Amino acid sequence: MTTENLNLPVRQYQKQYKGILSAVFEATKAFAGVTSAIQILDGVQHNAKAFSVKTNATPVVVGEYSTDANVAFGTGTANSSRFGQMKEVIYADTDVDYDYALSIHEGIDRYTVNNDLNAAIADRLKLQSEAQTREVNKRVGKFLSDNAGKTETLADFNEASVRKLFNDLSAYYVNTEVIAPVTVYLRSELFNAIVDMTANTTSKGSSVSIDNNGLAKYKGFTLVETPAQYFDTGVVAIFSPDGIVIPFIGINTARTIEAIDFDGVVLQAAAKGGTFILDDNKKAIVKVTSVALGG
């Protein structure tokens, strides 16, 4: 395949691609609360490392101040401290790697496109961004499942089983001392089971709406009905506080090149992506599998 370009310019679209992908992702992302704003960087050069974070594994020790006569004084002079043993605090640089790739490779022929060339390029970048967002949504769902610190299994969607699940997880979050509000991203099967529960009545302060098939919260958890295709196999729900997962994409290139074999341009883009969470936050993610769904 020839790479000659007859001295014609290569037009770069990294900035446009970055802006469109970022806007589309924020508008249509699944698991919207759990993920922070997507980090998109154009012109990346590292082929593996996305960024580094400062981490600290030094445990916190609650000490007691000693007033013993032989600590720091008497026989303990110059060889002991009333503050107790001293621990050194050191931060490590932890690299975060890319773990998947994205690409675009399309041709736009002036002779057949039946539209303005620049308008067609903008349309394709938008449509590609929408498709790539759906792909990233699936990857985030798989990432949440793989990194959940706790797994619960729901035997069925009966009212008693669902109520027990939420009661158990309410106690789990209280005892784990997760103070941030927790959102539940759940498939329609579980969401509808909660909406249809006989216990959800206005006399108990429930905001359930049969007309709109809606229920904002249950047992203190915010409910977000989420498409089934974004969950890992057998998973019916993900519980998580907001903002603890960072999705990121590095754009290597986005360009058009004048084609040799037809009267038009070749639209190409290459990018890498990944997802990150601190180990400390994994205990705050709970996945719920369903026997009925093969979990």
Please state what every model-predicted region is.
Residues 146-219:
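Extended, solvent-exposed, turn-rich assembly/linker loops in the middle of proteins
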Residues 87-152, 223, 260-271:
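Long, contiguous amphipathic alpha-helices that act as assembly "spine/axial" helices in icosahedral shell
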Residues 20-100:
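Assembly/oligomerization interface modules of large self-assembling protein complexes
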Residues 1-29:
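Short, extreme N-terminal leader segments that mark the start of a protein/domain
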Residues 208-244:
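Intrinsically disordered, low-complexity segments enriched in Gly and acidic/Ser/Thr residues
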Residues 8, 12-15, 123, 127, ...:
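Alpha-helix boundary/N-cap detector
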Residues 103-110, 184-190, 220, 227, ...:
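Helix N-cap / beta->alpha transition motif
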Residues 2-13, 242-295:
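Extended, compositionally biased alpha-helical segments that mediate assembly or anchoring
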